[in-house]
């Protein structure tokens, strides 16, 4: 889990737009965040396996 101070810092509007970055809404992870879901890859995988993301299923070939 991310520190609360870092999550609060990410939620504030930065002085310059290029400084803004996405964080996972569930765990606060700053890297590998899917914009479509607002979640990191780890949370997307866990929630997809649990069936908590509608329209998403595990592919196999």
From Swiss-Prot:
Signal peptide: none annotated. One of its GO terms (molecular function) is rRNA binding. It holds the Pfam family Ribosomal_S14. Binds 1 zinc ion per subunit. One of its GO terms (biological process) is translation. Keywords: Metal-binding, Ribonucleoprotein, Ribosomal protein, RNA-binding, rRNA-binding, Zinc. The keyword Hydrolase does not apply. InterPro entries: Ribosomal_uS14 (IPR001209), Ribosomal_uS14_bact (IPR023053), Ribosomal_uS14_CS (IPR018271), Ribosomal_uS14_sf (IPR043140). Zn(2+) binds at residues 24, 27, 40, 43. Its cofactor is Zn(2+). Binds 16S rRNA, required for the assembly of 30S particles and may also be responsible for determining the conformation of the 16S rRNA at the A site. Part of the 30S ribosomal subunit. Contacts proteins S3 and S10. This is Small ribosomal subunit protein uS14. It comes from Rhodococcus opacus (strain B4). The lineage of its organism: Bacteria, Bacillati, Actinomycetota, Actinomycetes, Mycobacteriales.
């Amino acid at each position: 889990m991310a520190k609360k101070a870092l999550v609060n810092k990410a939620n504030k509007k930065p002085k310059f737009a290029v400084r803004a970055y996405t964080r996972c809404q569930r765990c606060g992870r700053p890297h590998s965040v899917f914009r479509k879901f607002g979640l990191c890859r780890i949370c997307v995988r866990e929630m997809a396996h649990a069936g908590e993301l509608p329209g998403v299923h595990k592919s196999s070939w």
